[in-house]
Amino acid sequence: MVFFIAGYPKAGTTSLYDYLGSHPDVFLPEIKEPHYFTEDYPGAREVTTEDSYRGLYRDAEPHQLLGDASASVIHSGVAIDRICERNPQAKFIVLIRDPVAAVRSFHAELLHNLNEEVADFERAWRLQAARAEGRDIPGTCREPRLLQYWEIFDYRKQLPVFFNKVPETQRLLLVFEEFFANPRAGYRQVQAFLGLEDDGRSDFGAVNAARQHRVRWLAETHRKMVDGNGPMYRSLKSGISWLGIHPSDILARFNRKPGGKPAISAAFEAELREHFRPDVKTVEHLLGRRIEHWRH
């Protein structure tokens, strides 16, 4: 059986990937998000061929469930169809978060991975129309569609489609704030959904916490080192790799610091709350209950 931790970005998918990755009856590849089925976000895809995708699972044991934690699946317009055509019995786990908190955290993540360069989220939000037309795209952005923030967290459109396409027995929708208020209970729910025995996990520390670059141009240099892999980099890498040290890692660690979401004004937060109000209502309708954590 195969399963997908299908979304949403910045809603705990990395933590769940980490938890399930240590379960003896689960195999998750080292590449957390291959984005193989997300063909409408080509710049985000880490794996683009069938052979390469299958190769991610070559070390799986016959008894293990095979998982894919590409958080783009839920907001892609094609991924769920592609997956269901290939694996009609596939199961999907979707974590959802207060959309205002999620979109702000996603903006901070895009700043960190260099897909975004506008640190002021309000300005980045207002650039969406221009960017949809191909203007004001950062030179370091690998996939411009990621800059359409409202589109990534379009719960009102995406979740009803998801519910219609995937049978109830093959989908699990979890609320981020509730899951991490009692992660042990949430994790047991996930294990039961996947038909797994409890592995007894008791450590539920946060994974993929918010972070920032100290200096952006150093982050850009780091990406060029890794992507280009030129003669100077290869020479330096071969010279010190026997120590278990990689030059790109040294630079990345030096340039990394803990960081939260950039502050926004009360007026803009109120605007975001109003924008996402229909999305909150959609989620509550699908779950058949209020989500108190999202009420402001």
Predicted regions and their residues:
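The conserved 3'-phosphoadenosine-5'-phosphosulfate
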Residues: 32, 160-270, 274, 288-296
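A general structural signal for well-ordered secondary-structure junctions
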Residues: 26-27, 89, 232, 281, ...
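Alpha-helical packing segments of well-folded alpha/beta enzyme cores
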Residues: 53-56, 79, 155-159, 186, ...
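Aromatic-acidic/polar surface patches that form glycan- and anion
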Residues: 6-9, 46, 72-76, 147-155, ...
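PAPS-dependent sulfotransferase catalytic domain
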Residues: 47-59, 116-203, 229
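Short clusters of hydrophobic/aromatic residues that line enzyme substrate/ligand-binding pockets
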Residues: 37, 155, 291-294
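PAPS-dependent sulfotransferase catalytic core
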Residues: 1-75, 82-93, 99-139, 166
